[in-house]
Amino acid sequence: MDKLLERFLQYVSLDTQSKPGVRQVPSTEGQWKLLRLLQAQLEEMGLVKVTLSEKGTVMGTLPANVEGDIPAIGFISHVDTSPDFSGKNVNPQIVENYRGGDIALGIGDEVLSPVMFPVLHQLLGQTLITTDGKTLLGADDKAGIAEIMTALATLQAKNIPHGDIRVAFTPDEEVGKGAKHFDVEAFDARWAYTVDGGGVGELEFENFNAASVTIKIVGNNVHPGTAKGVMVNALSLAARIHAEVPADEAPETTEGYEGFYHLTSIKGSVDRAEMHYIIRDFDRKHFEARKRKMMEIAKKVGKGLHPDCYIELVIEDSYYNMHEQVIAHPHVVDIARQAMVDCDIEPQMKPIRGGTDGAQLSFMGLPCPNLFTGGYNYHGKHEFVTLEGMEKAVQVIVRIAELTATRKGK
């Protein structure tokens, strides 16, 4: 699996951080570099129908090597890394045969500690790939890309029976835009899997319903010495708004199937302020209730303001829970589960406290659960992946292809 590690290190060396609030897709030039590289590599591997769309989606097909009416399936990963933390000049550290304890991240005081991340206790003896403490790693989702590419090479080299295998690499997943421009008809798969999960065994087909909230506040600034009855402090209004949001329903206080409100940024002055929230919930009714709650808060805080001062709230849905779409096609999950069992992996089916391209694609007619990559602690300097986990992901992808080859016409 040396080639697997080589691919991964090549992909993370490219800065593909996406950027929110940008109309163009992909949102950054760096993503194009990786997309063009993947297009060239797929062509070099001999895949057919290799394309790169104007919106930055790479697609290709590994043709079937067996006859019969075998359903075409797909595997999908995204090229962008999170805007939450720098993805520039990623300098991975390779820790072979991890023996426990803290791992120094570069030169300085940053460490990857089992005290903060107890999962490390389960990874003794494995090869860990970490950051140097200055950037994220990019295992989300370049581990998935490397695993798909390696699985394709494995299917070819070992002549393992399979039907048509479609692959796709998308941009801007981290800012919720990649799948919006995905051509499901051109992809032409019966179903697919995103390879964008976490630890070994994760098999996910439930995710958050998600929305973004933008609150713009216009106040009135005058000299503080003569401000009584005249000044309207936009920052004070912002503070009042956040005080109304349930403090016990935040990311840091919730888990499992619990939803939350998350203030992601706030900026401004006395004159103007802007707040950005994200809303998440697995239950659609609770999701809608959370959106109504934000509207009620804005209305309450804005009541009685001078006509020239106001609070403007815009809510935009990002994606929905794929569960209802995927369970209508139980074999899609069953095959992945069986593939894991066949690879001596215990499937861990739990909800995604996040989203994937697969959530949107499932609502576009392409059932698309999520498979593990072997990575942990995404979107920050403590991100890492295990080589053994990546190898397991490759095995599962290959086994899914092999099992699907036995489902003629189904």
UniProtKB/Swiss-Prot annotation:
Q: How is the cofactor bound?
A: Binds 2 Zn(2+) ions per subunit.
Q: What is a single molecular function from GO for this protein?
A: tripeptide aminopeptidase activity
List localization entries.
Cytoplasm
The catalytic activity of this protein is classed by the Enzyme Commission as 3.4.11.4
One annotated GO biological process:
proteolysis
| Coiled-coil residues | none
Sorted alphabetically, the Gene Ontology cellular component annotations on this record are: cytosol
Q: Which cofactor does it need?
A: Zn(2+)
Q: Which residues participate directly in catalysis?
A: 80, 173
Q: Which SUPFAM superfamilies match?
A: Bacterial exopeptidase dimerisation domain, Zn-dependent exopeptidases
Give the residues the record marks as binding Zn(2+) 1.
78, 140, 196
Provide the residue positions that the database annotates as binding Zn(2+) 2: 140, 174, 379
Query: Enzyme group, top EC level?
Result: hydrolase
Q: Which UniProt keywords apply?
A: Aminopeptidase, Cytoplasm, Hydrolase, Metal-binding, Metalloprotease, Protease, Zinc
InterPro entries for the chain: ArgE/DapE_CS (IPR001261), Bact_exopeptidase_dim_dom (IPR036264), Peptidase_M20 (IPR002933), Peptidase_M20_dimer (IPR011650), Peptidase_M20B (IPR010161)
A UniProt-annotated Pfam family: Peptidase_M20
Q: Tell me what reaction this enzyme catalyses.
A: Release of the N-terminal residue from a tripeptide
Q: What is its main location?
A: cytoplasm
Task: Provide the function of this protein.
Answer: Cleaves the N-terminal amino acid of tripeptides.
Q: Which family does it belong to?
A: Belongs to the peptidase M20B family.
The family database entries (PANTHER family) matched by this protein are listed as: PEPTIDASE T (PTHR42994:SF1)
What protein name applies here? Peptidase T
